[in-house]
């Protein structure tokens, strides 16, 4: 009888332990699914100490090589991903003097005296009315947020595309921060907010494709920046022009402790020339929910023969605006799609996209509303 009681006590403890671990694991899985951005941030913070240690060891070796190489300069601006020598051989940074004289007939320089470096990032909420009032004094800003310098010829005509849903508190902060920076950089630019309506999961990549097509109908842009609304640059020397290779601007996010999460990370803020974006057939349309579309874009870029460049040093630092709502659900099918990136590249992208937009032009941006559904981007078998 006593043996039976002992067995029942053991069974009860085992049952309680099983229920506890089952509840804990299901809670964790639910959290990861419904709030993947937060979950990944916490996971990355746990891993960050190990990454920082490895980076410090790498930096020591890097500095030793720089010291022993007489032909190497320290204050570089750009380095291409994937090039073995690019970690050490970088171009020097030279910014023009304050008394530099511009010419309306000559291209604007890329390194202007007004670009001082560190920016004070204020993420305090502000109303759109206040932001409109602040920029109402600037008569050179045309409807849609279009602006071009008058004292020199802009080196790039930049369309800034912003995928959007339910982030109304972020937009005014974004414009308050970005407009002065792009004006300092003497770029011609305008903003396109692509807003997803309806009940389908958020499709960031498809919104970018819609925004690209509509922006090309609006003006003759030659550079396109794909910009999350909650990322604010911390350095005005992070030049928002394009180049011979696609550009990943947001190399160091504060929510990732200013460490690149992984080599192929291409999220947050990226830029391609119009020619480059068309060559890779844009973003994939099949990623519904959180995650995967940037990794697929990275694959498309490399399959098309490009490398990715990033700002050097602290130029690529960004602050993330805090969220006051739950993020998008995780897209569980992304890994299968990523396995077939190459096969899908030219059957899913700009060339299979159908949509009906509603366009409203605000003083500071063009709003493109679109109800996205999977049947708007039919994909052939692959």
Swiss-Prot record:
Protein family: Belongs to the glycosyltransferase 7 family.
Annotated metabolic or biological route of this protein: Protein modification; protein glycosylation; Sphingolipid metabolism
BP-aspect Gene Ontology terms: carbohydrate metabolic process; central nervous system myelination; central nervous system neuron axonogenesis; ganglioside biosynthetic process via lactosylceramide; glycosphingolipid biosynthetic process; glycosylation; lactosylceramide biosynthetic process; neuron maturation
Biological function: Catalyzes the synthesis of lactosylceramide (LacCer) via the transfer of galactose from UDP-galactose to glucosylceramide (GlcCer). LacCer is the starting point in the biosynthesis of all gangliosides (membrane-bound glycosphingolipids) which play pivotal roles in the CNS including neuronal maturation and axonal and myelin formation.
Protein name: Beta-1,4-galactosyltransferase 6
Primary localization class, coarse: Golgi
Record's GO cellular component terms: Golgi apparatus; Golgi cisterna membrane
Keyword Transmembrane: yes
Glycan attachment points: 71, 75, 83-84, 99, 122, 307, 367
CDD domains per record: b4GalT
Superkingdom, natural source: Eukaryota
Positions bound to N-acetyl-D-glucosamine: 292-295, 334
InterPro entries documented for this protein: Galactosyl_T, Galactosyl_T_C, Galactosyl_T_N, Nucleotide-diphossugar_trans
Binding positions for UDP-alpha-D-galactose per the UniProt entry: 163-167, 202-204, 229-230, 258, 290, 323-324
Places the protein is found: Golgi apparatus, Golgi stack membrane
E.C. number(s) listed in UniProt: 2.4.1.-, 2.4.1.274
Transmembrane intervals: 16-35
Disulphide connectivity of cysteines: 108-152, 223-242
